[in-house]
Amino acid sequence: MIENLELIRAQSATRAAGCDFMLLSSLHNVTYVSGFEVPVPVGAGAETAYGPSLVLCATHDAHNASWLIVSAANATAAKAQSRLAETLVFGTFDSFNPLDSRAQFLEQLLAIFKAAGLRNATVSLGIESRTTPHAVLELLTREFPYIRVINIDDALAQARSIKTPREIALLRRAAHIGDIGQRTLAELVQQAGRTEFEMWAELTSRMYAAVGHEIPVSGELVTGPRTCVVNYPAGPRVRTTQPGDAALMDISQRVDGYWSDCTNTHVIGGVEPTAHQKKFAHASQAAFDAALETLRPGKLASEVWQAANAAYEKHGIQMPHYMGHQIGAVVNELPRLVPYDHTPIQAGMVFAVEPGAYEGEGGTFGARSEKNILITESGPEVLSDFEWGI
């Protein structure tokens, strides 16, 4: 079995939290430890499956005591991708015979708990407080009264904080796919007259083609006056672009379980940006540069925010929102670049740095400048390779 550094880190963190076993239920943590890219839960496959994909794992044994539990709809992909010892499947739906998905899910889970030796033992089980199904907690209470349940949300977040070499490679690829989207937008904005929908369709299509299949994509593509405020969800819409309009795209995409998050701002139609537009775009870029210079091992997340804020002040613009966040199997994870987060920056972290500058309600322009940054021992490395639009 290939060494699974992500699983080892999760085991170490949850073992330190006092756990003998961990039961993972969130999309990102199951993906993180198993290597199976758990699908975003939409569509018939998600609706017919009673429970989510789960991982049960002993905190002391990486090879013989790890199970991935998935629905029948996900079985083929899970068995191909999983790096855990066993992959077990529960039924969801049958077109010709009744099938109780709830019973299938809980029976499979009960069998795995027994195989792990939980029935006759006093053990501590770490769970995720936000995503563990109530039916699973009922099963634990009824069948395993001696189990002590521990919340491991913080332990898992800490385990994921420093990226492994495998994760860094995946984040590089995700950033490359983000570059394709941003470069396509830079091409499309050279001519006015397209709708936001048309541009979004073209650039996401090119991203899909580069990956080889459809991928989860979220974010916004806004043009004209809608760029002057931050108002999620904000696009795309049917609006037809005009020469001189701003175009701002903040796009996130998940590739092989890992995210990119990048933003750029343009002026549409080959029109030279006005001095007013340059003021906001250059303030955003100056804040990005200040944050980038400060993102070094030993600095604090709050110090990155302070450096960016000083850049805003030099441009006479008030900081409108946070400066960014870590990124990985979660699109927006800790630490975040805010004045109250004093987490030390460490090599192996990957950030999405995203300062913006907006004219505000009633205005016509706003800009945001976001790229993905790997922290190395010698300083920051910019993973995103597209050029600023202004």
Segments from the language model and where they lie:
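Active-site neighborhoods and metal-handling regions in enzymes and metal-associated proteins
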Residues: 1-390
